[in-house]
Swiss-Prot record:
Protein role: One of the primary rRNA binding proteins, it binds directly to 16S rRNA where it helps nucleate assembly of the platform of the 30S subunit by binding and bridging several RNA helices of the 16S rRNA. Forms an intersubunit bridge (bridge B4) with the 23S rRNA of the 50S subunit in the ribosome.
Signal peptide limits: none
Subunit structure: Part of the 30S ribosomal subunit. Forms a bridge to the 50S subunit in the 70S ribosome, contacting the 23S rRNA.
Keywords: Ribonucleoprotein, Ribosomal protein, RNA-binding, rRNA-binding
GO cellular component: cytosolic small ribosomal subunit
Protein name according to UniProt: Small ribosomal subunit protein uS15
InterPro entries xrefs: Ribosomal_uS15, Ribosomal_uS15_bac-type, uS15_NS1_RNA-bd_sf
Pfam family for this entry, one: Ribosomal_S15
Gene: rpsO
An example molecular function term from Gene Ontology annotations: rRNA binding
Recorded family membership: Belongs to the universal ribosomal protein uS15 family.
A biological process from GO: translation
Superkingdom in the source lineage: Bacteria
Length: 89
């Protein structure tokens, strides 16, 4: 369920702070969100794939921790990211 290099580059160019940014919180959350969406689609078709379901839960937890960090340190960046990713509807 890994992201292709082209998809990663597209996400990082949109959400990164600069062209080669991979470590900013926004970039990490955007990449995790795309992986979560892909895994969710996979699990809709393969309902009994419990190994991937555990991986999904770990990714969701990691994204939750990063969002909590961002909300605590910079609320404006947090709200902007949530709106751009379409989370918290």
């Amino acid at each position: 369920m890994a992201l292709s290099a082209a998809k990663k580059k597209e996400i990082l160019s949109e959400f990164g702070l600069h062209e080669t940014d991979t470590g900013s919180t926004e970039a990490q959350v955007a990449l995790l969100t795309e992986r979560i969406r892909q895994l969710t689609e996979h699990l809709r078709e393969h309902k009994h794939d419990h190994h991937s379901r555990r991986g999904l839960m770990l990714l969701v937890g990691r994204r939750k921790r990063l969002l909590k960090y961002l909300a605590a340190n910079n609320v404006d960046r947090y709200r902007n990211l949530i709106a751009r990713l379409g989370l918290r509807r």
